[in-house]
């Protein structure tokens, strides 16, 4: 039997996941993180993107995170997300439209603030589309 630890993924609205997992993959403030059983204690910011959860027996789940905090303690990992949406609950058409609008804003931006905001919106839309794609593959 594979080693596991307890994971909680919580957003401001609801608890998205609570259970035993083999590992997770998430984008922290310093880059990609893979959290396995026995990981050293850690507290870091999470960038907008996805969390890949590998549950017991290898089943995968993908959740879009708009950002938040990751806390790793002995045998327990907690993700406090600003917003969390399961892959199957994301609207692909809406994400495609958000991506298109962000690309338009980038091409027509007239300043650093406009460009930075449009870039952030583009990153969110791309992350949502990636979560949708991976969720479809996992089904």
Curated annotation (Swiss-Prot):
Keyword Cell membrane in annotation: yes
InterPro entries: ATP_F1_dsu/esu_C_sf, ATP_synth_F1_dsu/esu, ATP_synth_F1_dsu/esu_N, ATP_synth_F1_esu_C, ATPsynth_dsu/esu_N
Membrane topology classification: Peripheral membrane protein
Name of the protein: ATP synthase epsilon chain
Subunit organization: F-type ATPases have 2 components, CF(1) - the catalytic core - and CF(0) - the membrane proton channel. CF(1) has five subunits: alpha(3), beta(3), gamma(1), delta(1), epsilon(1). CF(0) has three main subunits: a, b and c.
Keyword vocabulary terms for this entry: ATP synthesis, Cell inner membrane, Cell membrane, CF(1), Hydrogen ion transport, Ion transport, Membrane, Transport
GO CC annotations on file: plasma membrane; proton-transporting ATP synthase complex
A GO molecular-function annotation: ATP binding
Function statement: Produces ATP from ADP in the presence of a proton gradient across the membrane.
Main location: membrane
Family: Belongs to the ATPase epsilon chain family.
CDD domains listed in its UniProt record: F1-ATPase_delta (cd12152)
Location of the protein in the cell: Cell inner membrane
Domain of life: Bacteria
Keyword Kinase: no
Source organism of this protein record: Shigella boydii serotype 18 (strain CDC 3083-94 / BS512)
């Amino acid at each position: 039997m594979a080693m596991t630890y307890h994971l909680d993924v919580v957003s401001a609205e609801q608890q998205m996941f609570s259970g035993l997992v083999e590992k997770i993959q998430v984008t922290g403030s310093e880059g990609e993180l893979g959290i396995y059983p026995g990981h050293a204690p850690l507290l870091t910011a999470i960038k907008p993107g996805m969390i890949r959860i590998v549950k017991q027996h290898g089943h995968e789940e993908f959740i879009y995170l708009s950002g938040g905090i990751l806390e790793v303690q002995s045998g327990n990992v907690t993700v406090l997300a600003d917003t969390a949406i399961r892959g199957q609950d994301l609207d692909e058409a809406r994400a495609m439209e958000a991506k298109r609008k962000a690309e338009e804003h980038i091409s027509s931006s007239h300043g650093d603030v406009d460009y930075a905001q449009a870039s952030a919106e583009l990153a969110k839309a791309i992350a949502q589309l990636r979560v949708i794609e991976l969720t479809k593959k996992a089904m």
